[in-house]
């Protein structure tokens, strides 16, 4: 291959997609491709998102924008996997690749440049690629080619940024059948990665600049159910204490109905685990949740929150909710609002319902008009803003560990970063005044001021206690 071959990788969507993009980057670099951010690259690969309508539109807009230049455009990721040939027909400007093409991505791009792009795939339900019985899946998964699941002594990953925070995939797919969600159809059945592979990748990430690792999957509380160990996630989290160079690990995508006491204990109390619970409540009305084919309701969720805070009153809780689900009444919306006020969550994402192709809910009657959905979203988002701001104010005076990510653009004498109760990209940030710490440093500080959900903090002098994995805290 000529040395001049260049490729631009554009990442859209969630942290799981970021992991997949870094696998693609590693494969391309291994094959001699040079990564660039220039729009004039020989090929632009867009790692698309296909989750909800807004994300799909962003992916399409990004593909069209890239196609305006001289570069060849290739679509990978969830939108490409989900729609395949139909997307190719609608968008002849781009070559559409499947997850199955990832192991041979370099050859596929060579074919595109040579004028022989591969024929687009016909989408299939990827749940059918693995056995129905979970314990039979890990061995079969090696033959399927699941993105981000490679094992072996060498980590196939190339970091695309120098952030001190890095995502790490512990599982893929989902066995739940939520009526609003299409993800299992194109991400497949749930399958866990072996703990040894995860820990090897964690050490590699730490060796390449990561100080905090964020564990991602479609459903992290199911981790290990196919490995024959109901406490596999608890053991995995404990094992991260032995990864040299890490200051903390954060676990995301927890299903409330699957959260167990032992898991609460390790997340709430282990010194190297962020006391942070990312719980996908989705709603609070039991009636709406049943139609979503989910479990629980206000009472069960509040009991779970009480148990978390009994173990660690400082623990942070984040969740997402869907407003405007078919059949949702004004009483259901009121119950959701009351729940959010009582729950005192640290972070809340509010989404308006939209029909997704192939989902059960898309065929439900009693659809809510779009204008009414927007109105309900505005109402719940207003409550969410009040609740999260109140929760942030309650942290005034707390001592936290701030992982420094950079220098504040508005204040050269200040740094910004994230505490143990703030996840990068989805929660607020902490601005640390009078700070000269380097990126990746962990600084003990006191929260002295609140701005919405953001913290202003001051370093605590003379404090260096309590850091995991041999790391130091500056103060």
UniProtKB/Swiss-Prot annotation:
Positions contributing to [4Fe-4S] cluster 1 binding: 14, 49, 78
Domain Radical SAM core as annotated: residue spans: 160-390
The protein's Enzyme Commission number: 2.8.4.4
Predominant location category: cytoplasm
Note on cofactor: Binds 2 [4Fe-4S] clusters. One cluster is coordinated with 3 cysteines and an exchangeable S-adenosyl-L-methionine.
Gene3D superfamilies cross-referenced by the UniProt entry: Methylthiotransferase, N-terminal domain, Nucleic acid-binding proteins, tm_1862 like domain
GO cellular component, one term: cytosol
Gene Ontology biological process: tRNA modification
Record-annotated TRAM domain positions: 393-461
Alphabetical list of SUPFAM superfamilies matching this protein: Radical SAM enzymes (SSF102114)
Enzyme class: transferase
Keyword hit for Electron transport: no
GO molecular function: 4 iron, 4 sulfur cluster binding; aspartic acid methylthiotransferase activity; metal ion binding; protein methylthiotransferase activity
Keywords: 4Fe-4S, Cytoplasm, Iron, Iron-sulfur, Metal-binding, S-adenosyl-L-methionine, Transferase
Compartment(s): Cytoplasm
Catalytic reaction equation(s): L-aspartate(89)-[ribosomal protein uS12]-hydrogen + (sulfur carrier)-SH + AH2 + 2 S-adenosyl-L-methionine = 3-methylsulfanyl-L-aspartate(89)-[ribosomal protein uS12]-hydrogen + (sulfur carrier)-H + 5'-deoxyadenosine + L-methionine + A + S-adenosyl-L-homocysteine + 2 H(+)
Binding site for [4Fe-4S] cluster 2: 174, 178, 181
Cofactor field: [4Fe-4S] cluster
Domain MTTase N-terminal: 5-114
Family stated for the protein in its record: Belongs to the methylthiotransferase family. RimO subfamily.
Its job: Catalyzes the methylthiolation of an aspartic acid residue of ribosomal protein uS12.
Cited PANTHER family: RIBOSOMAL PROTEIN S12 METHYLTHIOTRANSFERASE RIMO, RIBOSOMAL PROTEIN US12 METHYLTHIOTRANSFERASE RIMO
Protein's recorded name: Ribosomal protein uS12 methylthiotransferase RimO
